[in-house]
């Protein structure tokens, strides 16, 4: 009667082929967007949109007279959040 560890080892052998698939899934061409004859990476547009949204958020927070602690960390986190959301939504 197989033990729990031997059953787990058999399952791992059955699914071991998946690991190389995930390792090479990022080896495709990078998404580039042509703008006036030049190709720019899509992360560049996500960063620009994220910067604009972060500045808008900063303006809203300033107009609401909200004082934030750790401003640098908060705006950096907002920038990263917006960039990842744009990447997820559009690419």
Swiss-Prot record:
Transmembrane segments: 33-53, 70-90
An annotated GO cellular component: plasma membrane
Keywords: Cell membrane, Lipoprotein, Membrane, Palmitate, Signal, Transmembrane, Transmembrane helix
Entry-linked InterPro entries: YtcA
Lipidation (S-diacylglycerol cysteine): 27
Compartment annotation: Cell membrane; Membrane
Residues in the signal sequence: 1-26
SS bond list: none
Coiled coil: none
Record membrane topology: Lipid-anchor; Multi-pass membrane protein
Source taxon at top rank: Bacteria
Lipidated residue numbers (N-palmitoyl cysteine): 27
Similarity section: Belongs to the YtcA family.
Name of the featured protein: Uncharacterized protein YtcA
């Amino acid at each position: 009667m197989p033990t729990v560890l031997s059953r787990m080892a058999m399952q791992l052998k059955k699914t071991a082929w998946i690991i190389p698939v995930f390792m090479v899934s990022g080896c495709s061409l990078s998404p580039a967007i042509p703008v006036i004859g030049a190709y720019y990476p899509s992360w560049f547009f996500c960063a620009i949109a994220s910067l604009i949204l972060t500045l808008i958020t900063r303006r809203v927070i300033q107009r609401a007279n909200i004082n934030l602690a750790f401003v640098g960390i908060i705006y950096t986190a907002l920038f990263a959040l917006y960039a990842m959301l744009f990447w997820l939504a559009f690419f």
